[in-house]
A protein has these predicted regions:
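Short amphipathic alpha-helical interface segments
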Residues: 111-144, 148-149, 153
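Compact nucleic-acid interaction/catalytic patches
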Residues: 32, 38-40, 47-81
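Short, cationic-aromatic polyanion-contact patches
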Residues: 164-175
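Residue-level detection of the helix-turn-helix DNA-binding "recognition helix"
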Residues: 43, 152, 156
Length: 175
């Protein structure tokens, strides 16, 4: 895994105004017309492409943006299926790059304040599988990446189990 910086350079009213702000890989602009519509960013791999991410659920499947004192996160991951084929997550102002060029693991990323969230996540796990996003929606001020991180750590501790194949990314408690 390779870590790069994610920086929101501006908020603009139209997509056409975003490009001048995208100077370095990881630079981003939020297109905001009565709420966030698009995230436009310079591809973090350095290929020079501008990646557009839909943030408006009214326009179809959309990513969610989380802004907090810890930084900005975008959920779920971004996976370009053309050109450079980059796969990355945006978590707390960092871009974590995945794939053969970068490695795969981010589970070792630790957070000093994770203990309380880990307990809250464990309390919300049950016999039925839930996604990190579903669990995060039940925990005020949490983000799906933090919850997913906790779920994976709970699996390593033998307190939770992750589904397989189509249920990958869904977790349940081990009794």
């Amino acid at each position: 895994m390779m870590k790069k910086r994610f920086t929101i350079r501006a908020r603009v009213e139209s997509r056409a105004k975003a490009s001048p702000y995208l100077k370095q890989p990881g630079d981003a602009v939020i297109v905001d017309r009565h709420g966030p519509r698009w995230l436009v960013l310079s591809c973090p791999c350095g290929c020079g492409a501008e990646v557009t991410v839909n943030l408006d659920r009214r326009a179809g499947p959309a990513w969610r943006i989380y802004e907090s004192p810890k930084g900005t996160s975008v959920y779920p991951s971004v996976w370009r299926d053309t050109d450079c084929e980059s796969h990355f997550i945006i978590w707390r102002d960092d871009i974590l790059m995945f794939g053969q060029r970068y490695g795969e693991s981010w589970i070792d990323e630790a957070d000093a304040g994770e203990g309380e969230l880990m307990q809250r996540v464990l309390e919300r796990l049950s016999d039925s599988e839930k996604s990190a996003e579903e669990i995060s929606d039940q925990i005020p001020n949490s983000e799906p990446w933090d919850v997913l991180h906790c779920c994976r750590r709970l699996c390593l501790q033998g307190k939770a189990i992750e589904g397989t194949e189509l249920a990958r990314g869904r977790f349940r408690r081990i009794e």
